[in-house]
Regions:
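Extended C-terminal subregions enriched in glycine
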Residues: 250-269
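A contiguous, surface-exposed recognition patch within enzymatic or periplasmic domains that forms
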Residues: 230, 238-247, 251-255
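Active-site microenvironments that recognize anionic phosphate/pyrophosphate groups
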Residues: 1-160, 166-238, 260, 271-274, ...
Length: 357
């Protein structure tokens, strides 16, 4: 049992870890697993090749990664200039300017990122590198946020595999805070902060999920969610676009293996919110270390990690599981996707692949 506070050095906040609470009685809502018996093509899906979107624009007959401007953008350079703020000086407003894009991973409606071949995952990351380079060079763009929402329980409106890009005239708060923390650490210590986290995780070893020469994945000591996983290059790079070809190849392999292990845990399309933490683009940010954070909302099959009083009201996360225990579960499953012959949890007594849980 783990029952303590753990310091989150990137966010400068305490995470309450109380693993005994995961076994508490539960009479509340359970979420059903979304059906994965999906066809390869859906005629009325606005992301499938050749189909019309709500704007009337018809998608290309694409065969790989497909990128287009979002028909319902969060930010746009065509957004109107807001009216003057109230005159009392307390309230302020600002234009919501930027670029919103959708990135389809595959023409196949029935696949997820975890099911794509490694070469296709690499191709996606290369496409995202190109998007970052293009958008970060635009006047008025201060930050390029890339994220994927996967699964109905996180509010996804379409299961066709895709992510989104918001290139904005402001810096999203979490990234702004992380950039400040890492810059301050770099100025004070003369070295980046994130490699210290990597060193601590490798020295401990219990929370590691996947490793290659130039990249690794782990559930951090200070994880806020059950199964929250970081995927990072070993070298400090400010953005995905800064990774070398070999670094990107290892990063793609580690990311894919991590997502496969999550799916294999309960033999399902594991839901998550996945965010690329990249340095803002408006100026240099010394010491910023690009990485991906994966935030799965489930703590058990059918049971969500709800954000409630401590998180929403108090501002500190309460993790009902021990990161070491959750990492051990992911370590114990196959790195071959269950739809391709991989298994779920291994039988500890046999030390090999066993029946899926």
């Amino acid at each position: 049992m783990v029952w303590e506070q753990r310091w989150h050095p990137l966010r400068r906040e305490w995470v309450i870890v109380s693993s005994h609470r995961n076994e508490r009685p539960w009479l509340g809502e359970r979420v059903a697993e979304a059906a994965r018996q999906l066809p390869e093509y859906v005629p009325d899906c606005y992301l499938c090749p050749g189909n019309a979107r709500s704007s009337g624009t018809r998608n290309e007959q694409y065969g790989g990664v497909f990128v287009f401007d979002n028909d319902h953008p969060c930010v746009a350079f065509t957004a109107p200039v807001p009216p003057p703020a109230p005159p009392d000086g307390i309230y302020r407003n600002s234009p919501a300017h930027g670029v919103s894009r959708v990135v389809c991973y595959s023409p196949r409606h029935d696949l997820t990122l975890a099911q794509l071949p490694e070469a296709d995952v690499l191709g996606l990351l290369q496409a995202l590198q190109a998007q970052y380079r293009e958008l970060s060079a635009r006047a008025g763009v201060r930050h390029v946020l890339v994220f994927e929402n996967k699964g109905e329980v996180v509010g996804v409106s379409n299961p066709h595999p895709h992510c989104q890009i918001y290139a904005t005239n402001f810096v999203f708060k979490t990234i702004e805070s992380e950039a400040e923390v890492q810059a301050e650490y770099f100025a004070a210590q003369g070295r980046p902060l994130f490699p210290e986290i990597i060193h601590a995780e490798e020295a401990d070893g219990r929370r590691l999920i996947a490793r290659r020469e130039m990249a690794l994945a782990f559930i951090p000591y200070f994880a806020r969610y059950p199964y929250e996983t970081f995927v990072a290059p070993r070298a400090t790079r400010a953005s995905l676009a800064d990774l070398t070809a070999q670094e990107l190849q290892d990063f793609a392999a580690v990311l894919r293996e991590t997502l496969i292990r999550l799916d294999n845990l309960w033999r399902m399309a594991f839901p998550y919110v996945m965010v690329l933490h990249q340095a803002p683009t408006d100026r240099p940010y010394p010491g910023f270390h690009f990485h991906i954070e994966i935030h799965p909302p489930l703590r058990k099959p059918g049971l969500l990690k709800y954000l409630a009083g401590p998180e929403i009201g108090g501002g500190n996360f309460l993790n009902d599981t021990a990161p070491e225990e959750k990492a051990a579960e992911l370590q114990a499953v196959s790195n071959v996707h269950y739809t391709q012959g991989g298994e779920g949890r291994r039988r500890a007594a046999e030390g090999g692949d066993g029946e899926g849980s």
